[in-house]
Amino acid sequence: KKIVCLEGDSAFGFSLAEVETMARYGMDVLIFVINNGGVYHGDSKDSDEWLKLRQNSLEGVKDGLRSTSLGWEVGYEKIAEMCGGKGYLVRTPDELSQATEEGFKATVPVVINVIIEAGQAKKVVSSFGSRPFLVPQHRLMTPH
């Protein structure tokens, strides 16, 4: 039986070493990593902006990466490849469809790294436990 997992990039950071265990025991697992470059949302709209924020952090300058930032488009799919599984990096619906089809055919651990918008232009407006949701800035209601 195939096991299908859906995790954010932050959650996958805590469990990525288990891909080696899955490969070692021949587990048939398909993992989708929803990658926005941050715990709630990323900090940057592109790699140049992220590198500038990172440099500010390294130099101790104001306006660096937030503590909830993650690396820019980290290649999580490579974890599966390094352990004997398969990995796919996807950015488009067509790539996602193709990788999903291949992932369901495979009998080794598969990681599909789904790059989505970082969401830096959004803000967390509510949180239920650890489940915040994001709303685009133009849709936020302001009190009158």
Enumerate the predicted regions with their spans:
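Thiamine diphosphate
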Residues: K1-H144
